[in-house]
A protein has these predicted regions:
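Alpha-helical transmembrane segments
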Residues: 1-6
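Membrane-proximal, non-transmembrane interaction modules
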Residues: 14-133
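Terminal, regulation- and interaction-focused segments at domain boundaries
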Residues: 9-13
Length: 133
């Protein structure tokens, strides 16, 4: 199911929609890792929720610098610029964005235990989220 959703997002007709799909993919991956990203709101507010979630040291509740290092905010801002900016993003822009989505989500997953990573792969949390169109 998740792979099919990913393929549909990447295959959307408009490149701006493919960028939006990349952001949705990032959000779904971090939601499956346990990040409490609100289903409604701006990309930036979602990115801030991701940053906050990954800034908590597991098992201690202490705050530290986010494992994302600001990547979630950078992705959100970039998605907004590509989607709402003048003209449509190029195919190269889309490829670069999806590459960064995958790299950022993989980096965040690497901060979690192997057990948590496995649970995220099979988690239905992201499948229950309302898809943005």
């Amino acid at each position: 199911l998740k792979l099919g959703r990913r393929k549909r997002r990447r295959a959307r007709e408009r490149t701006a929609d493919q960028i939006s799909g990349g952001w949705d993919e990032f959000v779904d991956r971090v939601v499956d890792l346990g990040a409490p990203v609100p289903p409604r709101g701006t990309r930036r507010s979602g990115a801030l929720a991701v940053e906050d979630h990954f800034a908590v040291v597991p098992g201690t509740g202490e705050m530290t610098e986010s494992a994302s290092g600001g990547a979630a905010i950078a992705l959100a801002d970039r998605a907004d610029a590509e989607v709402f900016g003048p003209g449509d993003p190029s195919a190269e822009d889309v490829e670069a964005f999806w590459h960064d989505v995958d790299a950022s989500a993989t980096e965040l997953a690497s901060t979690q235990s192997k057990w948590r990573q496995l649970r995220a792969r099979v988690s239905p949390r992201s499948l229950r989220r309302k898809e943005r169109k």
